[in-house]
Amino acid sequence: MMENFKHTTVLLDEAVNGLNIRPDGIYIDGTFGRGGHSRLILSQLGEEGRLLAIDRDPQAIAVAQTINDPRFSIIHGPFSALADYVAERELTGKIDGILLDLGVSSPQLDDAERGFSFMRDGPLDMRMDPTRGQSAAEWLQTAEEADIAWVLKTFGEERFAKRIARAIVERNREQPMTRTKELAEVVAAATPVKDKFKHPATRTFQAVRIWVNSELEEIEQALKSSLSVLAPGGRLSIISFHSLEDRIVKRFMREQSRGPQIPAGLPMTEAQLKKLGGRELRALGKLMPGEKEVAENPRARSSVLRIAERTNA
């Protein structure tokens, strides 16, 4: 039985407004979650509008299946495959907007059985889709010490990555860890300098979660796919929650807004320039939550919304 964990959608109005909804448009909510963005999009669509929602979490799919609306459809899978979902429906180049709310959701964090949080003891799982791939416990029990250290450093920006990785491997050698509390305790004991404002396991849990779910690769693939999926004038509205996510989104929008970089003085014909094409996107800026939203929902504090528009190139 699925418990009803509350989820407060971050930057709800701003993200949907960023899509510049047309009543007859076709939109994608790539991270359905508990449906906050999807329901607001549906409220702004007319009878001819369509919304395609995606999520790889079975609990999110169960919530989505309660929406009885002919304009709405839900797909169980990763948003990195959005180009395939769109092609199957013969909608390539016809999508008017894509919304992505990246990272882990509040219901996932709050449900101890999902294993995402060091604040609640539960199975050491961390998979967005518990039916596929390796759990965090399975990966940590089989990975080399150097690989664990690399993941902690790369995806958690953990300064004590090597020390923590060694402690994890030694603990698993004695008795394999299967619980979130066990991992949190091992990390805390291996951390020589404590941050009074942050739990010592914060960065480790983030890094392992990102690795287990291939989160950054998912984002990069979805962004790349968006260029073929969006119609001219179609919008990208993307919320990120930490610097690694935002860096990828920011870099992508910046690069696609510049167009091809041609060395100064390189002789090229008009035909060659035309073949290279122009810029693919027009960056429309970023937004961050206001003081009121952060006060009501502290998890919104680190969120950043970036919006871009598909050009006619």
Swiss-Prot record:
Entry's EC annotation: 2.1.1.199
Binding residue positions for S-adenosyl-L-methionine: G35, G36, H37, D55, F79, D101, Q108
Keywords recorded for this protein, A-Z: Cytoplasm, Methyltransferase, rRNA processing, S-adenosyl-L-methionine, Transferase
Gene Ontology cellular component list: cytoplasm
Pfam families in the cross-refs: Methyltransf_5 (PF01795)
Keyword Transferase assigned: yes
Catalytic activity: cytidine(1402) in 16S rRNA + S-adenosyl-L-methionine = N(4)-methylcytidine(1402) in 16S rRNA + S-adenosyl-L-homocysteine + H(+)
Protein family membership: Belongs to the methyltransferase superfamily. RsmH family.
The protein's name: Ribosomal RNA small subunit methyltransferase H
Gene: rsmH
